[in-house]
Amino acid sequence: MDKQNLYLGIDIGSTTFKAVLLSGDGTVLRTVYKRTQPVEAGKVACTGHCSACGACSGGSVKRLALEFLKVAGISSFSDISSFVVTGSQIVEDTKKFLPYDFQVSEVTAHVAGAKFLHPDVDAIIDCGGQDSKCMVYNLPMNLWTSMMSGVCAAGTGSFLDSVAQKLGVRIEDVADRVNYDSKTEFSSVCAVLSATSINKFKNRVPLGDLLAGACKAQARTILNSVGQLLLNAPGRKILFQGGVAFNKAVAYFLGKLTGSQIIIPQYHEVMGALGAAVIARQLHDLKASGHLNLEKVVYEPTRGKSVALRIKSTKHDFFSKDETKPLVWRNLFFPTEILNAMDCRVRTLETYAALFGRRADKVKEALGRAAQKGFDGQTCSFLRMLEGMDLDKPDFIVSTVQPCQQAERVFADLAREYKIEDRLYSLQTPINAHSRNAVEVMADGLAESVFEMEKAFGRKMDLGRLEEACVLSNEAAALAKKCQELRFTSPPLVRGSEAIYNAIVFSQLWGRQDLVDIQKAYYEELLMKKEWAEKRYKIGDTHRLLWLHLPPFYDTRHLDFIETTCNAPIVFEETNFVGWEPLDPKDPYRSLAKKLLQSGFLDPALRVEYVKRAVPAGQFNGVILYTHGFGRCSLADRALSKHLREELDAIHVPLLTLEGDCMDASIDPCSTTTKIASFAEALNLNRYGNIFGKLNETK
């Protein structure tokens, strides 16, 4: 082949290998779409030093890539000007076998490929063997928004593969054998249980009807899992790409369901690889121009006094054996000013469970014991941890009805198990902060809880100490607000992947001098870090992300990926936001009731309102919501994410929802990093005009 700039894009999926070779003038020189099989025996990974036999999975990929190039007249990777990879099967070891220049997310690759062929496209559905994706261009935001399916294979190529295999039909022949007028419907679109659905029908309806039911189910499930982005845009042109687009029947039923024009583009089966090749050309041009600036955001490295103070308080609170003080279990929301004023040993159970999050053996053991007691994955993993752990027997238990009623049931179960049902107090809390008489009802409830604890402990509440606790709480809150203001109005000062674990909203130190000392030290540290950061960055030099809800506690991998790999700082975290008015020490119960109502976590509407106010105040250009429990947690459920997305759309700020579990690493979706990467790439494209990052200023 004549010497010219050549750009290679490779997409390694769960069931296929795709590659595209692009010339310098944008001509598609060669493509390949090849189904792959798992390695039957032997190694699946090695050092990559030989990589000639192709016996391992990495070697096999390299062999396929070199064969692809050889047919095009290219002898080695060194003849390629720029090489970009994408796909769900790109892993850390892939670099040993494929000398690529950049890894792009599947979402961005599919958008780039689609726009290369159809520059006016603004809606895309991609359906592959492992996941399905929907990408829609949001004109007011000037960026692509996307959704990806989670851990379930329904709605992906795996489902139709299993159906075709069960019916003895080649997957390539399915569309031609479908009865497009059939009324047959499948109730199940589970790729694993598809045999059950088929067996229910196969001896009663013709083959064409069965295939029609499967294809309709496929189309419906694609829309159910990722098609929400298309709900407000009927009649638009949608590109349907990926391996499933070979099946024109699925495209037909997608058109029926959406009322839109479904277009299967040329090269639909290799669109991710085509997009990777297009991006390889963009990367080559930017590097050649010398404008690309890939420097990472850095932070003032001093580990401050506040960290040591937090560690000291945590160890004292959660591992103290001082039996002269009554032990009280609480949930995340019952006011600790009351418990600290009564000189209790406080144990916030959800926080206690989280402390063991990085001990995989402890988590596995606790979840296993909880399962034996009947608590499966439908129950919050924090609560399953509590059901499976050995806990010190408390003298009293306090909790709140909102925001987690599931926790109420588990707390009641634990009280029964520990034989202290008569020492459990559940504070009635409304879901709406503006409910009539909400403050009075809660204030009466707090007073009643104190009365019950006084009976249990055999001593009275010292109202002077409660007044003092309110004063200390106000001091800590005022300092927290100053810290908040500093972080809102400065370049990134600390890594969000570290600050998120402060979670002061849920702290059990409210009402104690400890929290005042911690927040004072933290504020002084932030002042120093602000001076350091402002010598290096302006506030608009970086992305500014707001993190909502809790993080995974088993490791910081996803947070590190956001901040380090994607170079997108998490500037602030919802769990460190203080938005309530100062307490009135002379009216403690009413004040604490107001504090609880104004925290935002009891009232979803108020919580969304806080986020809307925070976005302009902190100049955030992206928001991330971690939906613990895959949206089953009431603090991050589908209703909240829907409301949040609608409100953020109205102010043109993108929301990324990450499904996962804060405690159970075994069910972490493999698509999480893809979602994060595509979000960061979209932000880069919006802010810098390219997906890679900041450009050097030109004089």
PLM feature segments, named:
Residues 194-228, 607:
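Adenine-nucleotide phosphate-binding core of ATP-dependent small-molecule kinases
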Residues 298-326, 443, 447, 451-580, ...:
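A charged, amphipathic alpha-helical module
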Residues 7-59, 143-146, 150-151:
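Short glycine-rich, Thr/Ser-proximal phosphate-binding strand/loop in the N-terminal lobe
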Residues 332-333, 338-363, 546-612:
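Redox- and metal-dependent alpha/beta enzyme cores, enriched for Fe-S-associated oxidoreductases
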Residues 112, 157-161, 266-296:
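Glycine-rich phosphate-binding/hydrolytic loop that grips phosphoryl groups
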Residues 100-107, 255-274, 652-653, 657-659:
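Conserved phosphate-binding/catalytic loops in two-lobed NTP-binding clefts
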Residues 87-91, 230-257, 268-272:
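Glycine-rich phosphate-binding loops at beta-strand->alpha-helix junctions
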Residues 2-25, 121-141:
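Gly/Thr-rich phosphate-binding beta-strand-loop-beta motif of the actin/hexokinase/Hsp70
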